[in-house]
Amino acid sequence: MLVRPPAVAGTFYPADAEELIRLIEWSFTHPLGPGEVPEVSPVRRKASVGYMVPHAGYIYSGPVAAWSYYHLAQEGAPETVVIIGPNHTGLGPAVSVMPPSIWETPLGGVKTDDEAISELLKVSNVVEEDYSAHAYEHSLEVQLPFLQYLFGDSFRIVPIVMKVQTPSVARLLMQSIKEAMENLGRDYVVLSSSDLNHYEPHDITVEKDMLALEKIVNLDPEGLQEVLVKYDISMCGPGPVMVNMYLDKEYGAERAILLKHATSGDTSGDKSAVVGYAAVKFPLP
């Protein structure tokens, strides 16, 4: 079995398991977080198709990410978590799914849903199997400790990174995921990993982020693409978020729910050049 060692343990989050658990709990209880560690529902109560989560170092974006995980905990453990992130390394094809593997973190190993990966490759003409795109990519890896903290080893993952992030590719990917999961009868949730505007002053970033979040909440992928270009908003993972937007619309939803927005300036205190973060729930209608 292919094993993917952690690429950013010790940088984005602690390499020591006890320290990592403490930082996850700090994220939940932080003033910018939900304010408490969630109780995980012992039974599955699916209330969403997925969530948007940030992917910076935990000390910066952990409290915002915690909002999505707090709400997911209330839904109980899904069978499969499809985690989609942007391709920061430039390696691999346009859309890459990780081959069957175990992803190691300081909290243990997370197994891929091998059957779901196989089915996705069978039904999709946009997804290719590739390891190189995933070897050093942090946007998926940083989600795993939160999932492990909540659900232990009861879930499997389908890790996907997008190098091409247009609305049309996002729609094709959404259709492929939905078809593959329905063919297998999977109970699944989609996590869209993305940060928002990068490296501008706090006030400008908040302004730009709100323009993007308005389109995200209104489930308008094409509108999101337009405002990103028009206002030069450096959101790194619009494609993964568009997948959840299209998926929510497929299920008849009209709006997503903004759970929390903040910037790295809110957590670090340095507001001169910040990155924006949001937690968004894509609810079942």
UniProtKB/Swiss-Prot annotation:
It comes from the Archaea. InterPro entries: MEMO1_fam. Belongs to the MEMO1 family. This is MEMO1 family protein Igni_0992. The lineage of its organism: Archaea, Thermoproteota, Thermoprotei, Desulfurococcales, Desulfurococcaceae.
